[in-house]
Amino acid sequence: MLRSCAMRLRTLGATPARRPEATRRLFSSEEVVCKDYALPNPSWTKDLRLLFDQFMKKCEDGSWKRLPSYRQNPPQALQEFQTHFVDSKFKKEEQMSKAQQFTRSLEEGLGFEYAMFYNKAEKRIVCLFQGGLHLQGMPGFVHGGAIATIIDITAGMCAFSEGIVMTANLNIDYKKPIPLLSVVVVNSQLQKIEGRKLFVSCTIQSTDEKTLHTQATALFIKLDPDKPLT
């Protein structure tokens, strides 16, 4: 299932280029003038706010970095992504300008509420996730597809630290259902790199780490700027 992890540019506001270090504004201090949806809003529960504050304190010494999250791609990032990776006939610019990041397309509190933190030394992403009422599968619980989505974007961010990537494979073991509006911790780790292949592991646990909700492994492929996607 070749699902686009490349559109994580939405979150990063990154500018694709041949040099990976120049592509990811997410991992730099460069400002992007857009609303950042990875900040507290009235829908966040006390548990989510508490965890967010704890990780913000970890950011003070520079070991962790909070990652911003936007609803739409900055125009320049979108244009340069298409220039490097997509045939010009693929989509018209006016069409793509209306596209929104899937996980940010619902009203605040109803869908995906999350904040991500990146540890460069550990090659790890931690996502604090609260599933809203419009993510329901079985009554009272988060839909398995929504869980797969939050795993995909969290694991993808680990891989994205190495370059622009797409999801090639995602294997998920659902252990315990996740109640709606509960807060869980999605922990993703870059395990190894083999050429353009990046292997990532991921778990979802309760905030007290006593309950393992989900385990997953993922394979991402680093894109080649000389080979358009279409």
Swiss-Prot record:
Name of the protein described by the UniProt record: Acyl-coenzyme A thioesterase THEM4
CDD domains: PaaI_thioesterase (cd03443)
Lineage: Eukaryota, Metazoa, Chordata, Craniata, Vertebrata
UniProt GO MF annotations: long-chain fatty acyl-CoA hydrolase activity
Residue positions, PTM N6-acetyllysine: K65
Reactions catalysed: hexadecanoyl-CoA + H2O = hexadecanoate + CoA + H(+); octanoyl-CoA + H2O = octanoate + CoA + H(+); decanoyl-CoA + H2O = decanoate + CoA + H(+); dodecanoyl-CoA + H2O = dodecanoate + CoA + H(+)
Keyword Mitochondrion annotated: yes
Family affiliation: Belongs to the THEM4/THEM5 thioesterase family.
Keywords: Acetylation, Apoptosis, Cell membrane, Cell projection, Cytoplasm, Fatty acid metabolism, Hydrolase, Lipid metabolism, Membrane, Mitochondrion, Mitochondrion inner membrane, Phosphoprotein, Transit peptide
Pfam families: 4HBT
Provenance organism: Rattus norvegicus (Rat)
